[in-house]
Structures are given as C-alpha cells and as structure tokens.
Amino acid sequence: MSETISCRQTLAVTSHRVLASDLNEHETVYGGALLSLLDGTASISASRFARSQCVTAALDQVNFIKPFVLNDSLCIESYVTGHGKRSLEVFVKVIGEHLDTGERFLGMTAFLTFVVLDKQVILPELSAETLEEKSLCADFQKREAYRRQKIAEQKKLQASLSLDFPWQS
C-alpha cells in the first residue's frame, strides 16, 4: 500500500519585494522574471511530493491577472494537484500586496508539469483537504487530457519545422 501525502504537505511559499531592477519598460514586473520565480517555488512542491529529482516539463495555463509594481510584495504559493506514474502537476498562485495600503490581490496563476527522473520512484497518493485543493484536484484529469492532446499537436508541428538558418540560404 502506498503512502498518502496531502496537498498541504507539498505547499511551498516564497515572498519577494518588487524592486526597480524587477521592472520592465511598462514599470511592472517583467513576466520572464516572475516565471523564473514561480518555477523555482513549484519545483520545491514537486520535490516534496516525489522525494526525488524532478524537472519542469511544461508550463500551462499561465494567467497574468494583475500587474505587480514597484514596492509591491508578491507571495508565491504552490502545491501538487495531481499526478500520473512519473509526472505531476503543481498549481501556483501569486498573491500581490500593495505594501503602502495592505491591499492584496491575485496577480497570477499557472499549472506546471514536472517529470520524475528516476523511473523506479513510485509516487504517493494525493489527498486534498481545503475547498480550493479539492476543486483543483477534481479537475486534474481534464487538464491532463487537454495536455496530452496539446502534446500530440505539438509533435506534429515539430515534425514540420525547419532547422535551417534562414540567413544561410
């Protein structure tokens, strides 16, 4: 019988203050920098679940909801919401706070897929406790089916792509 781990046991939380060096030309946090931060946090959740080395395989359903600006803080929360034999899904939400007023807001959400490198690892069962966790875990199979469909489409696309450099014709 396999072990059961709760979503809460995979929870990883990181906080960051937005500095001038984080901003793009629109004076909001550069999206690529934010993606790097959330990938790092999500990887902790993946490792807590698998207790093995995992790599990021996909970043899905990235929703930039509200921008982060200078002197905001952002709190990244991630936890596992489903898994297959060697892959697992991590949900990430980024909560912003305007530090001068204390107002909080949902700034971003995303789902990341990680793959366990060690083929011998047997992933534990996952249990959800809160309403949010139960809702996200309940829809895992739908998201997984959609990802599989998109992977098949991506493979067709990749087969048609040229690897020649256009300037060397």
Role assignments for model-derived ranges:
Residues R8, A12-T14, V69-L70, T81-S169:
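HotDog/MaoC-like acyl-thioester-processing domains
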Residues E25-T28, P67, E103-R104:
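Short histidine-centered beta-strand/loop micro-motifs
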Residues V18-L19, F64, F114-V116:
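Hydrophobic residues in beta-strands and at strand termini
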Residues S2-D60:
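A positional/architectural concept
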Residues I5-Q9, S43-G82, R86-L88, F105-T109:
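Hydrophobic beta-strand-centered segment that forms part of the acyl-chain substrate-binding groove
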